[in-house]
Amino acid sequence: MITARQVRAARALLDWTQDTLAEEALVSLTALKRLEDRRELKVHESTRVQVQRALEKAGIVFIATEGGRGVMLVQRPNATVMS
């Protein structure tokens, strides 16, 4: 399960606004704001999945190890990065 911090960090790596990510993920801006909230508000699992897929399509890789969670940007030949 991706975390609010991972989503915010991924968006920063892509230089995307919340509006851009919401549009790419086909979720409402309100749903995305709930997902990114530091208080870890409850969100629909479908929202989480759609956001993760949109970020992965743009080249984000989600990392989860015993040492913690994170993200990294991998440039893919066919990745479309909007700004």
Features from the language model and the residues they span:
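The DNA-recognition helices of helix-turn-helix-type DNA-binding domains
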Residues: 28, 38-39, 58
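Short basic helix-loop element that most often maps to the first helix and adjoining turn
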Residues: 7-20, 76, 81
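Helix-turn-helix/homeodomain-like alpha-helical modules used for DNA recognition
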Residues: 60-83
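A short, Lys/Arg-rich alpha-helix, primarily the initiator
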Residues: 1-12, 63
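Non-catalytic, surface-exposed connector residues within folded enzymatic/regulatory domains
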Residues: 1, 42-45, 65
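DNA major-groove recognition helix of helix-turn-helix/homeodomain DNA-binding modules
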Residues: 45-62
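Short alpha-helical DNA-recognition segment
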Residues: 16-34
